[in-house]
Amino acid sequence: MPRSVPVMTDVIQVTKRESTGTAATRRLRRDGHVPAVLYGHGEANEHLAVPSAQVKGLLRHHSKTVQLSGDVDETALVSDMQWDPLGIEVLHMDLIRVNLKEKVELGVPIVLHGEAVGVREGGMLLENVHEVEIRCSAGSIPDNLVLEVSELGVGEHKTAGDLTLPEGVELITDVDVVIAHIEAQRDEEIAEAGDALAEPEVISKGSGEADE
Protein backbone atom coordinates (compact mmCIF):
# COMPACT_ATOMS: atom_id res chain seq x y z
CA MET A 1 0.00 0.00 0.00
CA PRO A 2 1.35 3.51 -0.80
CA ARG A 3 2.65 5.42 2.20
CA SER A 4 1.81 9.02 3.00
CA VAL A 5 5.03 11.00 2.60
CA PRO A 6 5.95 14.53 3.64
CA VAL A 7 5.96 17.17 0.94
CA MET A 8 9.36 18.63 0.08
CA THR A 9 9.67 22.36 0.76
CA ASP A 10 9.73 24.33 -2.49
CA VAL A 11 11.88 27.46 -2.85
CA ILE A 12 10.21 30.44 -4.53
CA GLN A 13 11.66 33.81 -5.45
CA VAL A 14 9.66 36.78 -4.16
CA THR A 15 9.90 40.53 -4.55
CA LYS A 16 8.35 43.17 -2.33
CA ARG A 17 5.45 45.19 -3.69
CA GLU A 18 5.44 48.92 -3.09
CA SER A 19 2.01 49.50 -4.67
CA THR A 20 -0.99 47.44 -3.60
CA GLY A 21 -3.90 49.12 -5.38
CA THR A 22 -6.18 47.52 -7.95
CA ALA A 23 -4.36 48.99 -10.96
CA ALA A 24 -0.95 47.90 -9.61
CA THR A 25 -2.26 44.40 -8.94
CA ARG A 26 -3.60 44.09 -12.48
CA ARG A 27 -0.25 45.19 -13.91
CA LEU A 28 1.47 42.64 -11.71
CA ARG A 29 -0.69 39.82 -13.06
CA ARG A 30 -0.17 40.97 -16.66
CA ASP A 31 3.58 40.80 -16.03
CA GLY A 32 3.28 37.13 -15.01
CA HIS A 33 3.21 37.44 -11.22
CA VAL A 34 0.76 36.53 -8.47
CA PRO A 35 0.25 39.00 -5.59
CA ALA A 36 0.73 37.54 -2.12
CA VAL A 37 0.72 38.68 1.49
CA LEU A 38 2.99 37.25 4.20
CA TYR A 39 1.88 37.60 7.81
CA GLY A 40 2.13 36.00 11.25
CA HIS A 41 4.49 35.66 14.23
CA GLY A 42 3.57 39.17 15.34
CA GLU A 43 5.54 40.78 12.52
CA ALA A 44 4.38 43.34 9.98
CA ASN A 45 2.62 42.12 6.86
CA GLU A 46 4.74 41.91 3.71
CA HIS A 47 3.11 42.45 0.31
CA LEU A 48 4.91 40.25 -2.20
CA ALA A 49 4.94 39.22 -5.86
CA VAL A 50 5.51 35.57 -6.83
CA PRO A 51 6.24 34.42 -10.42
CA SER A 52 3.18 32.65 -11.84
CA ALA A 53 5.35 29.78 -13.10
CA GLN A 54 6.53 29.08 -9.55
CA VAL A 55 2.96 29.17 -8.23
CA LYS A 56 2.06 26.52 -10.82
CA GLY A 57 5.00 24.49 -9.54
CA LEU A 58 3.58 24.66 -6.01
CA LEU A 59 0.28 23.34 -7.33
CA ARG A 60 1.95 20.47 -9.20
CA HIS A 61 3.93 19.48 -6.11
CA HIS A 62 0.97 19.98 -3.73
CA SER A 63 3.36 22.05 -1.61
CA LYS A 64 2.11 23.21 1.78
CA THR A 65 5.29 24.86 3.05
CA VAL A 66 7.60 27.06 0.99
CA GLN A 67 10.99 28.66 1.48
CA LEU A 68 10.86 32.31 0.40
CA SER A 69 13.98 33.71 -1.23
CA GLY A 70 14.87 37.05 -2.79
CA ASP A 71 13.60 40.17 -1.03
CA VAL A 72 12.35 38.04 1.88
CA ASP A 73 14.07 35.07 3.53
CA GLU A 74 11.35 33.21 5.44
CA THR A 75 9.69 29.81 5.69
CA ALA A 76 5.94 30.05 5.15
CA LEU A 77 2.80 27.95 5.05
CA VAL A 78 0.49 28.39 2.07
CA SER A 79 -2.74 29.10 3.93
CA ASP A 80 -5.02 30.18 1.10
CA MET A 81 -5.20 30.68 -2.66
CA GLN A 82 -7.84 32.79 -4.38
CA TRP A 83 -8.82 31.65 -7.89
CA ASP A 84 -10.47 33.28 -10.87
CA PRO A 85 -14.17 32.46 -11.45
CA LEU A 86 -13.24 29.60 -13.80
CA GLY A 87 -10.81 28.07 -11.30
CA ILE A 88 -7.92 28.27 -13.77
CA GLU A 89 -5.61 31.04 -12.54
CA VAL A 90 -4.48 31.84 -8.99
CA LEU A 91 -5.27 35.50 -8.29
CA HIS A 92 -3.79 35.86 -4.79
CA MET A 93 -1.91 33.88 -2.14
CA ASP A 94 -1.90 34.09 1.65
CA LEU A 95 1.32 32.97 3.35
CA ILE A 96 1.84 32.48 7.10
CA ARG A 97 5.29 32.67 8.67
CA VAL A 98 6.33 29.39 10.30
CA ASN A 99 9.40 27.54 11.41
CA LEU A 100 9.63 23.93 10.30
CA LYS A 101 9.46 22.58 13.87
CA GLU A 102 6.35 24.38 15.05
CA LYS A 103 2.98 22.63 15.04
CA VAL A 104 0.40 23.71 12.48
CA GLU A 105 -3.18 22.66 11.81
CA LEU A 106 -4.46 22.25 8.26
CA GLY A 107 -6.52 20.11 5.92
CA VAL A 108 -4.94 17.40 3.76
CA PRO A 109 -6.59 15.35 0.97
CA ILE A 110 -7.49 11.67 1.25
CA VAL A 111 -6.46 9.09 -1.35
CA LEU A 112 -8.46 5.85 -1.56
CA HIS A 113 -6.30 2.82 -2.32
CA GLY A 114 -7.33 -0.61 -3.58
CA GLU A 115 -10.26 -2.17 -5.42
CA ALA A 116 -13.01 -2.78 -2.89
CA VAL A 117 -14.53 -6.26 -2.60
CA GLY A 118 -17.96 -4.63 -2.56
CA VAL A 119 -17.36 -3.01 -5.93
CA ARG A 120 -16.45 -6.37 -7.46
CA GLU A 121 -19.73 -7.67 -6.02
CA GLY A 122 -21.68 -4.97 -7.84
CA GLY A 123 -21.77 -2.22 -5.21
CA MET A 124 -20.75 1.42 -5.54
CA LEU A 125 -17.83 3.01 -3.66
CA LEU A 126 -18.85 6.46 -2.41
CA GLU A 127 -16.44 8.96 -0.85
CA ASN A 128 -18.18 11.02 1.83
CA VAL A 129 -15.21 13.20 2.85
CA HIS A 130 -12.33 14.31 0.64
CA GLU A 131 -9.99 15.78 3.26
CA VAL A 132 -9.39 15.77 7.01
CA GLU A 133 -7.84 18.18 9.50
CA ILE A 134 -4.48 17.25 11.02
CA ARG A 135 -1.85 18.69 13.35
CA CYS A 136 1.87 18.20 12.70
CA SER A 137 5.14 20.09 12.41
CA ALA A 138 5.32 22.51 9.48
CA GLY A 139 8.25 20.58 8.05
CA SER A 140 6.43 17.22 8.06
CA ILE A 141 3.14 17.97 6.33
CA PRO A 142 2.08 14.92 4.27
CA ASP A 143 1.05 15.27 0.65
CA ASN A 144 -2.05 13.18 1.40
CA LEU A 145 -3.38 10.47 3.70
CA VAL A 146 -4.05 6.96 2.39
CA LEU A 147 -7.21 5.00 3.18
CA GLU A 148 -7.11 1.29 2.27
CA VAL A 149 -10.51 0.18 0.94
CA SER A 150 -9.72 -3.17 -0.75
CA GLU A 151 -11.43 -5.23 1.99
CA LEU A 152 -14.53 -3.04 2.11
CA GLY A 153 -17.74 -4.99 1.40
CA VAL A 154 -21.28 -3.93 0.52
CA GLY A 155 -22.85 -2.09 3.45
CA GLU A 156 -19.48 -1.46 5.12
CA HIS A 157 -17.65 1.81 5.67
CA LYS A 158 -14.30 3.28 6.68
CA THR A 159 -13.86 6.18 9.08
CA ALA A 160 -11.20 8.81 9.72
CA GLY A 161 -9.84 6.51 12.40
CA ASP A 162 -8.89 3.99 9.68
CA LEU A 163 -6.52 6.42 7.94
CA THR A 164 -2.82 5.61 7.82
CA LEU A 165 -1.07 8.44 9.69
CA PRO A 166 2.66 9.12 9.27
CA GLU A 167 4.76 9.43 12.41
CA GLY A 168 4.24 12.77 14.11
CA VAL A 169 0.87 13.46 12.47
CA GLU A 170 -2.16 13.85 14.76
CA LEU A 171 -5.74 13.60 13.50
CA ILE A 172 -8.00 16.50 14.48
CA THR A 173 -11.09 15.34 12.58
CA ASP A 174 -13.33 13.08 14.69
CA VAL A 175 -12.24 9.45 14.27
CA ASP A 176 -15.87 8.38 13.74
CA VAL A 177 -16.41 10.56 10.66
CA VAL A 178 -17.25 8.25 7.72
CA ILE A 179 -14.79 8.74 4.86
CA ALA A 180 -16.07 6.15 2.36
CA HIS A 181 -18.68 3.40 2.16
CA ILE A 182 -19.97 0.74 -0.23
CA GLU A 183 -23.59 1.11 -1.25
CA ALA A 184 -25.60 -1.64 -2.92
CA GLN A 185 -27.09 -0.72 -6.28
CA ARG A 186 -30.88 -0.56 -6.32
CA ASP A 187 -32.72 -3.16 -8.41
CA GLU A 188 -33.96 -0.53 -10.87
CA GLU A 189 -30.40 0.74 -11.41
CA ILE A 190 -29.21 -2.80 -12.16
CA ALA A 191 -32.16 -3.34 -14.51
CA GLU A 192 -31.49 -0.08 -16.34
CA ALA A 193 -27.82 -0.99 -16.73
CA GLY A 194 -28.80 -4.39 -18.13
CA ASP A 195 -31.29 -2.84 -20.56
CA ALA A 196 -28.66 -0.39 -21.77
CA LEU A 197 -26.30 -3.26 -22.53
CA ALA A 198 -29.01 -5.36 -24.22
CA GLU A 199 -30.37 -2.63 -26.51
CA PRO A 200 -28.35 -2.01 -29.69
CA GLU A 201 -27.45 1.59 -30.44
CA VAL A 202 -29.56 3.14 -33.19
CA ILE A 203 -27.12 4.83 -35.54
CA SER A 204 -29.83 6.21 -37.82
CA LYS A 205 -33.55 5.81 -38.16
CA GLY A 206 -35.57 6.15 -41.33
CA SER A 207 -39.15 7.34 -41.80
CA GLY A 208 -40.37 3.86 -42.66
CA GLU A 209 -40.93 4.74 -46.32
CA ALA A 210 -38.80 3.32 -49.11
CA ASP A 211 -36.54 5.73 -50.94
CA GLU A 212 -37.92 6.72 -54.27
From Swiss-Prot:
Query: Keywords in UniProt for this one?
Result: Ribonucleoprotein, Ribosomal protein, RNA-binding, rRNA-binding
One GO biological process term: translation
Name used for this protein in its record: Large ribosomal subunit protein bL25
List the gene name: rplY
Query: Pfam family of this protein, just one?
Result: Ribosomal_TL5_C
- Family, similarity comment: Belongs to the bacterial ribosomal protein bL25 family. CTC subfamily.
Q: Which GO terms describe its molecular function?
A: 5S rRNA binding; structural constituent of ribosome
Cited function: This is one of the proteins that binds to the 5S RNA in the ribosome where it forms part of the central protuberance.
An example GO CC term for this entry is: cytosolic large ribosomal subunit
Q: Does the keyword RNA-binding belong to this entry? A: yes
Q: How does it assemble?
A: Part of the 50S ribosomal subunit; part of the 5S rRNA/L5/L18/L25 subcomplex. Contacts the 5S rRNA. Binds to the 5S rRNA independently of L5 and L18.
- Region (Disordered) spans which residues? 190-212
